[in-house]
Swiss-Prot record:
Source species of the chain: Drosophila melanogaster
Compositionally biased intervals (Gly residues): 1463-1473
Ranges annotated as biased composition (Low complexity): 1-12, 867-879, 890-904, 943-968, 1080-1095, 1161-1173
Disruption phenotype: Impaired walking characterized by walking uncoordination and reduced climbing speed. Type I neurons are apparently unaffected. Abolition of responses to stretching: although the dendritic stretching is not significantly affected, the Ca(2+) responses to both acute and obtuse joint angles are abolished in the mutant. Axons and cell bodies are indistinguishable from controls, while the sensory dendrite exhibit abnormalities: in some of the stum-expressing neurons the tip of the dendrite is overgrown and extended into the distal segment of the joint.
Gene that specifies this protein: stum
Domain of life: Eukaryota
UniProt feature, compositional bias: Basic and acidic residues: 386-410, 686-700, 880-889, 911-938, 1133-1146, 1450-1461
Pfam families on file: Spec3
Full protein name: Protein stum
Amino acid sequence: MQQTLSYSSSSPSPSPMPMPSASAAQTPPPNPNLTPNLNIRPSTNPIPRPRSTGGESAFQPAIIPVDYSYRTHTTRSILSAQSMAPSTFASNQSFVRQPSESDAQPYSSLFGDPVPPPLQPDDYFGTAAFETLRNGSVELPSSEEDALVAAMALNALIPAARERIFPSVPYSRTPRGSLLPYLQPPDIQILPNSSGGSSSEQLGSPNYRLLAPDDILNKPDVYDLENEVEEYTVVGQRMSFDDEEDEPTRTPSQAPAKLSVSSITTEDHRGLLSDSYSGRDWFRPAPQHFPEFTRIPRLRPSSKMIMSMKQDEGPLSPLATMIQDMNSSSSGGEERVAPNQSRPVSRDVVLSPKQYLEEQLGLERGSQRQSLEDYRMPPPPADPPPFRRTDLTEQDDSRSVEPEHSLKREMSPVIIRDSIPMGGDYRVEQPRPHKKTAFTILSTGQAASSAPRPPQQAPTRGRHASIQSTSTTTSSPAGRPQISPRRRSIFGSEPRLPELPSALGYTSHLVHQTTDDSPRPSVQFNMSGRHSRSKLAIPQKGILQQRDSLTSSIDTFTPRAQIRRGSIGRDPIRSLPYGQKIKSMETLPLINDQHRSSIPRLHYGSTMDLSRPEPAVFPPGALPRPLKPNLNPTRRQRGLLKIINKEESLTHNPPRSNWCSLDDLSRPSFDGTPNQARRRSSSTSPERRSSTQTVSDRRSSNLSSVTATTSDFSFRRPTLSTLPAAQTLSRMRRKSVQALSPNRIPNRIPSFGQRRQSIYQRDQEPKPLSRHGKIAKPSTLSPIIGTPNKDSSSAQSPNHRSSLMADAVDTPSEVSTRRDSVSRIPVRKSPDSRSSSPPKDFGIPASGRSSRASITRSPSRTMNAGSRSPSRSMHPSRTSSRESGRPGDSRSASRGPPSRPGSRLDQIGSRMDRPNSRLERSSSRAERSSSRADRPSSRFDVSNSRGNSRANSRLSINSSSLRSSSISPATMARNRSMRATTPSRRKSISLSPASAMMGRRKSISPDAVGQNRRVSSRGKPEPPEILSRRNSRSRIPTRSTKVASKSPPSSSKKRSKSPEKPKAMGSTPKSNKVGKGVTAKGSPKAKPKIAASAKPKTKTESLMKPPVKNANKTPVNGRPTTNAKKPASKAISTKDAKVEKGKETGKSVASKSNGKETESSVKSSKSQVTKTKPPGGTTSEAKKPATTKTHGITLEKGTNGTDPVGGIPPLAAQVGNAVLQAVEAVPAVTSEVTVPSTPGGKGAGGANMSKLVRMSSRMSLLSNKSTKVRSDSPQNRKVATVQEHATEKEETVGASSQPMSNDAAAILEKSQKTLENIQKTVTEATDEIHKTISENLTDLKSLENDLAADPSPTPSSGTTMARPGESASRTGTADGSIAPQSSGELPKSPFPPTQPIEASVSVLHPNESSAERIASVPEVECESSDLPTALDASESELVGNVMPTPESGADFKVDAKRRSPDGQGGSTAGSGGLAKSSSQEFLEDKDNVKKGGLCGCCSKLFMPCRRSRCSRCCRRRERNESAEDQPVLWSGNSSATTATNVQVIDETKPKRKKISDWLKSSCCRSCRKKPAIEEHEAHQEEVSKRTNQAANMSTGPRTRGKCGLCLSKVFCCRSVNRVDPTTGDETEMKQCCFCIPCRRGSRPNKKGSTVSWRDQDPELGIKPTESSVVEGASEAAMSAATDAGNDQVKEGCCKRFWLMLLCCRKRKRRESNARRQSIRAPPPSEDTRKKLHVDLVEYSSKMKGAIPVLPLYLAWFCAFCNVVFPGLGTLLSGLFCLCVGIPRFSQFDSARARIGSFIINIIVAVSQFFCVLFCFVGWGWSIWWGTIMLRCAKKLSKIKKVERLELEEEQRQAQLAEAGKNGVAEADKT
């Protein structure tokens, strides 16, 4: 406020002071008289003044233009005779300042009366922020802004005034021209002062008060009528300053005095003002008094006190005055402002902040009448304000008379006195409580002025554009300063402003000075608010200034001012010549109501408009505000955050939008619709724009918490807005949500149904609330609290919520940003009443609205399209899941960041699935409350998948913004649409555990977002595109759980899934995956097999009884949302549910219903599973369909044309029963089984079941491992699936399961037999594996816990997670995000951690139907065509889903890998350790092969397309022993850790390999010749290594396939462990299609020593044995490297080159293995990669580093070539480097380094050759290069020699030691 005052006083002083200097003694006494005379003069003096101000003309424009812009325009029309006189003009300038000060009040009256009666503005100002602001004083912020706007508008309206605004600069003749600019800068300074100190209040009030703070406020009559009227009439812009300066001067001699002032000219004024009040001083030229103003900001604490610079104080420097006034009661000054405002709103300041205040008071006094006259364009303001204005002028004149000793000085002091009253009174209701509102207090006073403002408002509006435009012009502000600055000039007690004569030269200079002064004082006072362009751009005291900028945007939104402008000056503004400045004013007036931004902008605009009288006057704060105008408004902004929001609207339609926004804030009834629209549409942009520009400044300016708040809002809102920016709907929604946020406390529940309405309602509420809340000013703590705190407290606390809620309502961007959390919370809370605690979601907000609340709630809403109660119910779930408090279900809700897609999905699934988890409970409640299984299911699916992927992956702001968008009701609708899409995405995720994890990770988060939006839609279908995209990802996890639950949502999901899934699974459920189904026998199971890949429904059939509805989501997932979606759902369910999961769904669900390894009967388990699947929120629905799933799904699938249900249910029954029986903990098996069907669809319940399934899978694998669990493992890693539990499951399945039952019975018998055989093998393997597991389980658990994934107690959980259906857990494991799900699983099936058997079991004789079925089930691709039985079909379906999952999961190369490492060992809690078992090792190989039927390459290539099958290699593999591969994979996936990897290898069907004969034909002989035994041995070695070294286990498979990457998969190179069912012997069978990619000799075994890719790969040119390469390598390592090198040599450079080109490097595989092993504590492994000796490494230059280390002979050759032919040797060295040489970039060789070296050498060689043309430089260069090569080669040879010697020495020592040991031993023996 002090700033504002100082600016005001400084601004007025220049023009008043200069003019009065001649008549300083004369004018002051007459000032009081002149004030009455001014009332009379309006007709007499005004004309003479301009005319007689010939000499003063130069003077006048400087002063009058700014102030006169406001008053002179109107006054000109009214007092054309008066103001026309040059002397009168001079007097007017003096008086203009004073009346300007009082003008603010009259002006408020002026605007208030003419346009919308002052009551509206009063309501507006008093209502929200301005009630607080106007408590003590005339509240310049509203009036001031309105005055600025109105002045601009009136100036525009009044042609004469306009002429004076622009002609007014010339009006002053030569002196005035200069004076005008000069006065304008002071005025601007004053305005910035107001804006800086008290943007809204003190802006206007200081403008007027600064002119004559004491005089105008205390003696309004002196300055008001005569001076201001004359001023406006005669002076024009200059009149503003003249009013302040000359009004005292006029008091002694009105016309003569003014003439004298005019005669005084700029120089005279300077002389008069030169004292302490010289115009410049008053202006506070940056060089001179800027320091003082800088000090003034130091006085900022007192700035809340009105710096009433009394006339005596006036002579003091602005700083001294400010200090004095600060210390003195600013309230008194403000009170003066009120009287001054009551006095005529001197047309000097032409409705500048001062005039604005004067106008406001003008309603109370004659000054206001004159102010109205000034704004006579709008009739209402014209007459009343002039009289009141006259009164104000008289009072001001009286005050001015007091300082008459130095007219300029007196005027400035008077102005100072009147203007400075920014303190106490204004501070009453300052909007930024955190700060001592020196200027905010003015805003408080503005409440009163807000009443008169309606007339001003229209003019302000009118001027709004002009103000902005004017503000934009920095030069014009010079003329403007007189507008509102003149009174605020008080701060510049020294009549710097009065130094008008210098304004001629100083006009622009002063503008800058003002700007400079303003910035610093503005920090402290509103001075910054009036800061000039530079101030705006670079607030020097950044806090207030920056804040002003924020507030400027906010202030711009002053709806009330805007209204007035619209009524009065809007048209004039547009017609104003200073249209550019109107823009600034546009911003300013909009804000003027609430944030006193109008004044700050006016001040700045005045500075800007000094060249243009009116533009300067009107936009003093306008342009500054656009840039960084209202620091003080920023302060108010705290209280008036919604102004900030409205500021956004202002951007589009600044005056109206601003007014509307503020109006909405203050008065709900005002322009409600525009408020909403603008707020939403532009709430973010203007505020952000302004705040963004001033963000650093605002932040840097820590003056007020508003700054922090504003900047935080700016940043946050922009951040959130940016996130939602991409999503306009989201942004709108966010705004709606924001509305909810404000409404949250008052309207939250009411607005639950209507976000957007709620916003508007809230807006309306906050308006009254603002009145009540008094702008919810942040307390002094606000700065400490910070913007967010203030914002949130404002939003939530009653008062703060009133104003800030309105603010938030108005500022969606700010709310979206900073309040996004709050808004989101309200959204959740409101829509989802369950999650009613905002704090709970507050941590989530960034991701919150859309992440937790929105996702969980949204899914609930989506599911409960009709019932929001479930949504709310879901909300707690969502919240819980976000918090990830629940191990299993909480994951979905918690959306733990660790593994976004999988882990989140799994977490969601597990949390939602786990009834104990709050998420599940809340979900269950949501389900129950909604009692719509479909909706809860869909919601859960969306919530789980989306919550997991999105909450976890998008806990960040981005994710939250996306979610946030999704959260709004519209988003909820969108989420529903998304549901349709999710199934396919879910399918994709469901593919293979590893690939599913990858896919989820990749796609779930987007899908999650989509689902979030869809959930946000709350049943309102949002754009299906977004939904399908987002939903598909997140949906997969959720769907499994909620397939049955969400029949209708599933329909949507099915639709979307159907399209998406077909990509991975093939659009046609049955025939899409023909390749996969090719092997399928004609039997129904064969069909399901086809469906397995192309027909998710088959899987759904067997796995998901409910999915029957949802053919797609047959799996326990709520996927089968609708039978209508069956077709799409089939493919989707296959993917998502994955037949495995479908089969296991019942069990999994059962176990899920238990929530843990429930050991309830299969039936109860099944029904519970059905219930449990939906537990997230689909529980009630899921329960119904769950049972239906078992029965109806299978049947439905048969109906759908998927495999006959009979085939699948037996599989499901077998799997379920076998798993249940095999695993003592049926729930665990069930969980495992369910997970597969949950893979994509069962995000919530499925994820939980995943945990259970994994645990049960491990347990069941322990017991059922030898049972055809592995065969069944394709069914979902439920290795023991085929066990007795199958019978139970059949029972549970009931009728629908019976078709499968028959098969299941046979399969069960066979499987039991096989199980016995397998169990033997498994027992052995289990013992071994248990050891490994025991060793690694602890590490795995600890790692999983560390990974934030709740590791299931047993690796089986990991296996379950690894399932495609369990993509969530799988994903979580790989990413570490699965860990939460694992954790959830841990509680579910905790006891099989060590139980899980990782033994890779391949059934060699799948002749038995059970074995066949098992094999076929693993082979989703129909590789197990041997098992065309129902079980086979069901398994095929299951695997088909799995296969599609790998297809979709094909992207997830990690899918298989994760299955085995993540899914098996890594993914599951104990999976890491278990993964190390031979089974896991096998799985790794299989993973690479992609059991899903997609090779890793195909997965990568086609996963995005969701291609159901992989290319030739995959098809071949399908025909080949995919059953072997996939069963293992599935075992690894479903129960990799727990269950033995069981492969049913039909030895009678070894011809499958023959299918790949064509590929094999291309294999190299060595590869073809390689006996499987050798490979098996190598594999066994690797297996043993893995078993012993859990960390190295994943590496083992890599070594086996050196490429271990795309090539091995592309060419289907994979090794399968064949297990003889009778003997249990395991044989590694290598299926190699292409020798080069495979390269799988026994070398992998040697990998230990030659770990580096180049050691193993022929790519590395140098053999690992080279001592130079193998630095520090052990002898064994060296020998191993040598062996590997020999192998490499055999392969040859060409092969290496191709391998390199094919990117078939182990490094990738190592990375994947690292991911797998990431779960386990990685054992400290030495880097066995070959190292180049440090001495040979070239670190300094890449170019030199490209010179390879070559063998000495090659180096000599290259050097010779370089000498003979420059560059040739370099080129050859590059070529040699590819095969032989070693690049010296680093110690470690790599293909990239070699290629890089080759490229660099080519470049260098060419350069060397061509450089020979230039002075033979290239020759020397070439020779130098050859020398370096020789040197390196020699060094290498030396190193090799030394190493050889060392090696020999070591060997000798070892021999000696051995001999010594032997001798000792012999001695001991003897």
